[in-house]
Amino acid sequence: MQLNSTEISDLIKQRIEQFEVVSEARNEGTIVAVSDGIIRIHGLADVMQGEMIELPGNRFAIALNLERDSVGAVVMGPYATLAEGDKVKTTGRILEVPVGRGLLGRVVNTLGEPIDGKGPIDSDGFSPVEVIAPGVIERKSVDQPVQTGYKAVDSMIPIGRGQRELIIGDRQIGKTALAIDAIINQKDSGIKCVYVAVGQKASTIANVVRKLEEHGALANTIVVVATASEAAALQYLAPYSGCTMGEYFRDRGEDSLIVYDDLSKQAVAYRQISLLLKRPPGREAYPGDVFYLHSRLLERASRVNAEYVEKFTKGEVKGQTGSLTALPIIETQAGDVSAFVPTNVISITDGQIFLETDLFNSGLRPAVNPGISVSRVGGAAQTKIIKKLSGGIRTALAQYRELAAFSQFASDLDDATRAQLEHGERVTELMKQKQYAPMSIADQSVSIFAAEKGYLKSVALNKVGDFEASLLSFMNSEHADLMKTINDTGDYNADIEGELKASLDKFVETQTW
């Protein structure tokens, strides 16, 4: 068969038109050194800070040091099989994690991959772990409460939606217990929770997950895990991953709560990475940007206004504000709050709950020291009835502490001083609370009302706990309507005060404790 020149040119033209060029221009480099989870790469000219670098075997590293002739990157996971001379590629994107409602009730690692054996996660998409916090104009003032269920916290150190409240204290004195109870208390409040475990034992995290499940709070919670045995890079990035998952709800006009347990271990992981990258060490061998490490994370916790939510959702959600409340945890050494990381985080947050070893050992749990614990913005968000009733609680405890120290040296005390001491002792006893037993607004209100109005005067100190338990049982069975009204409205007026007084008078007559 012979083809003429026209047919040949048409055929060539057709082939040219159908030809598709599928090429991907990606920068490629070579590993020149591997040690302790850090790789040095030569030849990556246009890599950006924080960019994911593709390694052999479908693994990734993150570029942290951009130097004149090499790039320092930290490997996300095991690095034993990496060798000098291996080829790596830039990806043009920073680390992203899955977000969405499909993550609720699941346990995931830093990268958002499920580790609970419940199958794949149905996410709504991916979001970058590092984003800029909302600006001042996009924020709204904190004026709605987050109930922790602890009398000592909700009455004296109230937390608002969108606040950052630090939980600080030595090891093994109930920091995690307080945060977990706060999560358990949100199971019916509509607040979605994220629990980020950094540098902890796997057995400890398994116990926390089991307790959340037992109390029906896991279905409302995302657990992000970077155990002590995992790479320092994963421990450093875990809080940012959890924050991104919490922001998903905030940006859609919902309320969320995130617990970072704990940021001391994250700072240690970051120090390890920085020293291996040969960055110059500063105070306590931490790098110069360890303040920025925590500030850029905690500034993302905020309450955003309705305009921000409407703009973010492209008009799908209107007239609703969103919030992300943060409870960062910091572990101190021998009660030293003046160390580098504790002072940094205290200055970033909107208040702190200080837990004290001596109080814990004396049997006061939660071991909250009301003298140096403070909430800078939560007062505006406090429930009305708790705010009205709890005004004298902090004062009573502060006076009691002062007088208790003084009375050890005084041989005889006048009646007024003795009355103050006895009242303080009973209020201190009333503030004790069991773990995994968060209290409703009504229960807290009744207990505080009893203390404020002098109903504990005639109760023996060792019977205060029994008195409270019997009182709450009586109120919830005999005056369920009143308790429901308080829980629903949180209001306090002359009618409610009168009803509470009549109910307590009736209970005291029964002498059933």
Curated annotation (Swiss-Prot):
Which parts of the chain are coiled coil?
A: none
Q: What is its EC number?
A: 7.1.2.2
Q: Where is this site: Required for activity?
A: 373
Q: Does the keyword RNA-binding apply?
A: no
The chemistry this enzyme catalyses reads:
ATP + H2O + 4 H(+)(in) = ADP + phosphate + 5 H(+)(out)
> For this UniProt entry, what is the primary localization, expressed as one broad class?
membrane
Q: What keywords appear on the UniProt entry?
A: ATP synthesis, ATP-binding, Cell inner membrane, Cell membrane, CF(1), Hydrogen ion transport, Ion transport, Membrane, Nucleotide-binding, Translocase, Transport
Annotated compartments: Cell inner membrane
UniProt GO cellular component terms: plasma membrane; proton-transporting ATP synthase complex
Q: Does the keyword Translocase apply?
A: yes
Matching entries from SUPFAM superfamilies are given as: C-terminal domain of alpha and beta subunits of F1 ATP synthase, N-terminal domain of alpha and beta subunits of F1 ATP synthase, P-loop containing nucleoside triphosphate hydrolases
Give the binding site residues for ATP. Answer: 169-176
Its placement in the membrane is given as: Peripheral membrane protein
Single GO molecular-function term? ADP binding
Q: Which family does it belong to?
A: Belongs to the ATPase alpha/beta chains family.
> Its function?
Produces ATP from ADP in the presence of a proton gradient across the membrane. The alpha chain is a regulatory subunit.
Q: How does it assemble?
A: F-type ATPases have 2 components, CF(1) - the catalytic core - and CF(0) - the membrane proton channel. CF(1) has five subunits: alpha(3), beta(3), gamma(1), delta(1), epsilon(1). CF(0) has three main subunits: a(1), b(2) and c(9-12). The alpha and beta chains form an alternating ring which encloses part of the gamma chain. CF(1) is attached to CF(0) by a central stalk formed by the gamma and epsilon chains, while a peripheral stalk is formed by the delta and b chains.
The name of this protein is ATP synthase subunit alpha
Q: What is the lineage of its organism?
A: Bacteria, Pseudomonadati, Pseudomonadota, Gammaproteobacteria, Alteromonadales
Instruction: Write the gene name.
Output: atpA
